[in-house]
C-alpha cells in the first residue's frame, strides 16, 4: 500500500488524527511495532494539543490518505532556521510493514525542502528504549547525534527514559 494521497491536515481531521496517533503510539501492543505502551502511559495527544499544533505558524502537519480517503498516516514538521524537526509521525498499525511509513517520511522531507529550500537537515527525537525504531530511522539516513534529553517529567512515565536526537542531512 504505497499509493497515498498527501495533504495538509485540517481542523476537521482532528478527531480522526487523535484516534490514529493514540492508537499508533499507545495501543495495539501486539500488532504495532511502534507502540510506546510498555514505556509511556496515557494519551499521546489530545484534541486540544493537536488544535494548538495546527495553529503554529512554523509547523505543518501532513496526512497520508488511502484511496478510500481514510487517514492512515501523519507527520509533523516544525521549521526553525535551517532545520526541520520531524514529529507526530505515525502510521495506522493495520498498514504497517507496507512501506507507508517510508513513503510518508520521504514525502515529508521533500515537502520540507520545497517549502524552505535553504534547509540543511532534519532532526527528530526518539525514545532511547526503542532500538528497532532507531534502527529504522538509521536505515532512512538519520544518525544519532549524541544529544539526549530526559523524557518530560510531567509525562509521569515511571521508568526513566531519554529522548535521543537523530539528524539527517537534506542537502
Residue ranges and their predicted role:
Residues 118-171:
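C-terminal "cap" of GNAT-fold acetyltransferases
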Residues 43-63:
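A short helix-loop-beta-strand connector motif used in the catalytic cores of GNAT acetyltransferases and
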Residues 10, 78, 87, 92, ...:
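Residue-level recognition of the GNAT/N-acetyltransferase active site
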Residues 1-15, 168-171:
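Conserved N-terminal entry element of GNAT/NAT acetyltransferase domains
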Residues 103-121:
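Conserved acyl-CoA
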Residues 63, 70-78, 85-90:
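Conserved beta-strand in the GNAT
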Residues 22-50:
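Conserved GNAT-fold acetyl-CoA-binding loop/helix
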Residues 70, 92-106, 128-135, 139:
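Conserved glycine-rich acetyl-CoA-binding loop
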